[in-house]
């Protein structure tokens, strides 16, 4: 999947072949039974399961075959980037980060793809390839509509009107911006609180690392 996404035809980096082994080690060392991930990671999980099966055939029942835990909402299983094309990826520069402040989120939302362009808001809108509506599908709630856009009861009502025309993409982006920032505000607050005690963060990481080493050592 990664090779296709990056359009590697030749001179494929060794990391593309070795990284699945490294990921499998991170999972199996702790005998994890469930791995929360997006559907783009399903091939990697299958590689891990195959490695576990072959290892256990040789050395006995030592490792555990993990299962993938996908988000309940199908749209969240492979959330596209803000460009509406590839998956959200740091290397592709199409991400909204949990650490982004409100101004940064709005800057990114304004640049989000609306799918097929329209000459005016009176023209019917298009949902296919429209990253704004994909994100609304993933994150908006009926309560968000009641708070920020009471003209519509829910996302389905907005969609019905949007495809008929009369709703500007800018208005939809403003609504999405409100939805995202409402969700991110508590995260920002908590992050700020932790930033005031960096030594404690390192202390937590140290304790976690020690516990992880102990667990992995038992498996090894």
Language-model segment annotations:
Residues 1-24, 143, 179-184, 188, ...:
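N-terminal Rossmann-like or analogous alpha/beta NTP/dinucleotide-binding catalytic cores
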Residues 7-11, 34, 121:
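A short glycine/serine-rich beta->alpha loop
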Residues 13-55, 59, 80:
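Internal, conserved structured core segments that host functional sites
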Residues 43, 49-220:
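Conserved nucleotide- and phosphate/pyrophosphate-binding catalytic cores
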């Amino acid at each position: 999947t990664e090779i296709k996404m990056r359009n590697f035809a030749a001179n494929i980096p060794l990391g593309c072949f070795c990284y699945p082994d490294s990921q499998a080690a991170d999972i199996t060392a702790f005998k994890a039974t469930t791995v929360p991930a997006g559907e783009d990671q399903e091939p990697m999980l299958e590689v891990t399961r195959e490695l576990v099966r072959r290892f256990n055939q040789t050395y006995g029942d030592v490792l555990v075959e993990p299962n993938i835990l996908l988000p309940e909402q199908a749209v969240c299983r492979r959330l596209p980037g803000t460009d509406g094309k590839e998956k959200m990826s740091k290397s592709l520069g199409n991400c909204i980060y949990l650490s982004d402040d409100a101004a940064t989120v709005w800057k990114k939302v304004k640049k989000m793809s609306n799918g097929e362009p329209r000459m005016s808001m009176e023209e019917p809108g298009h949902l296919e390839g429209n990253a704004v509506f994909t994100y609304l599908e993933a994150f908006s709630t009926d309560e968000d509509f009641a708070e920020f856009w009471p003209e519509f009861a829910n996302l389905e009502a907005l969609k019905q009107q949007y495809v008929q025309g009369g709703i500007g993409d800018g208005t939809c982006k403003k609504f999405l911006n409100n939805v995202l920032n409402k969700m991110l505000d508590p995260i920002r607050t908590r992050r700020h609180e932790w930033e005031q005690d960096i030594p404690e963060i390192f202390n937590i990481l140290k304790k976690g690392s020690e516990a992880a080493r102990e667990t992995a050592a038992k498996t090894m």
